[in-house]
């Protein structure tokens, strides 16, 4: 992450002159060549792309694993995360703030943005009807394929009303999402059908359904309660 940041700022703001008269594209003295030596990576040189008006892109980290949280605390300006409940989201944000304080960063410099999958109708009933229509469009084979890929389980041939089988501990994928889905299935006593319908739309993010006011109230609650920025 530090190496990438160095390359993003290896030109002065006014280095690229693009002067037709002098045929000078950039001022040589405006360069800041990178010579980075880290524990696992060595990188030297510079990129030939000028800085944006903002200086550099926003640094965003996605995920909720232990290494991901620490990386976010050390380097990120925004975190995109999947959290299913208000309490889980609050705990996640507080944990990031604690890690930041431990290394001397101001928690206010990081924005936590949980993913949300809203279905908005004119009324609660209309939103629920829309959800049912979308669920009917999801083929079981597609839903099971998505769910199996996110949990590391082979679900082929299993009854749709069966519970999620035990997920492998050596899953070589998004482990934080695997954990989220396994815990959600246990907490809500979900069948494979319930779970793949949830995954096929929201991909494990927070799903909310209702009228405009109900949706806005729920989003506001997460912000006011300290679950999101």
Which residues make up each language-model segment?
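Hydrophobic faces of well-ordered beta-strands that scaffold small-molecule active sites
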Residues: 57-62, 77-81, 110-117, 223, ...
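Short glycine-enriched loops at secondary-structure junctions
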Residues: 64-66
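Long, repeat-rich segments with strong aromatic
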Residues: 69-78, 83-85
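Short amphipathic alpha-helical segments
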Residues: 73, 93-94
């Amino acid at each position: 992450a530090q190496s990438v940041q160095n390359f993003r700022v290896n030109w002065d703001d006014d280095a690229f002159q693009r002067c037709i008269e002098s045929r000078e594209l950039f001022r040589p003295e405006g360069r800041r060549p990178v010579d980075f030596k880290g524990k696992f990576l060595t990188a030297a040189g510079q990129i030939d792309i000028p800085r944006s008006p903002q200086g550099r892109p926003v640094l965003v980290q996605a995920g909720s694993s232990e290494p991901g949280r620490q990386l976010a605390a050390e380097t990120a300006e925004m975190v995109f995360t999947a959290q299913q409940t208000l309490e889980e989201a609050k705990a996640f944000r507080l944990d990031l703030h604690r890690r930041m304080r431990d290394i001397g960063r101001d928690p206010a410099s990081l924005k936590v943005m949980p993913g949300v999958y809203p279905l908005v109708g004119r009324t609660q009933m209309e939103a629920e009807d829309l959800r049912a229509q979308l669920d009917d469009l999801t083929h079981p084979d597609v839903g099971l394929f998505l769910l199996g890929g996110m949990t590391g389980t082979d679900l082929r041939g299993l009854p749709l009303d069966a519970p999620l089988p035990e997920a492998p501990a050596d899953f070589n994928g998004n482990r934080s999402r695997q954990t989220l889905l396994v815990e959600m299935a246990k907490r809500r006593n979900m069948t494979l059908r319930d779970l793949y319908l949830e995954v096929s739309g929201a991909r494990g993010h927070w799903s909310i359904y209702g009228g405009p006011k109900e949706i806005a109230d729920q989003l506001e609650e997460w912000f006011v309660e300290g679950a999101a920025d």
